[in-house]
Amino acid sequence: MATANGTRRYLRIALIVIAAVEAVGALMGVPGIFYDFNPTTPLGKFAQWLTSADLVLAVPITLAALYFAVAGRLRYAIAAIAIRVLVTWLSDLPSFWIHGIEWSLSYGGITVAVYDIGAPLIALAAIYLAWRNERLGLATLLVALPTILTWLGVLAFAIGVMIHGF
């Protein structure tokens, strides 16, 4: 039983870190709610509305995830982070109609394809695992992947700037 408690503690710490990083990012995005890109088409206006809705929902969802993680309610924390991933993915859907499918064999194209296909799958899988109270470690890893991959991209960019200058 001590092993289960130890594993649970590590999952809780991981979820606290992921939820805190996401909450800080959500709070930093609040000014974007009020920015007007002056879209000229109805689809552009809808896309801006979805982005604003995503930014508005990000704060309570990530703060709820942080609360649940701190309170030790791991299933709810996993579900909240997964819902955040789904909401962000949904807000990106109009880009299919605005820009077309942007998948290609370049790094950017592969990244977009993996996100477009992978984000809803991992979020739904994590929600399912949390709902069933099974394999919470895997569910935690799944909801952490978008955050981890985002910060690895930032790190790679920073290293590139340090090596080659800006």
Place the predicted regions along the sequence by residue:
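Cytosolic juxtamembrane helix and N-cap/initiation of the first transmembrane helix
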Residues: 1-25, 42-51, 67-82, 133-144
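Membrane-water interface at the C-terminal end of transmembrane alpha helices
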Residues: 8-13, 119-139, 155-158
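Aromatic-anchored segments of alpha-helical transmembrane domains
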Residues: 21-28, 83-95, 145-156
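Juxtamembrane boundary at the C-terminal end of a transmembrane helix
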Residues: 152-166
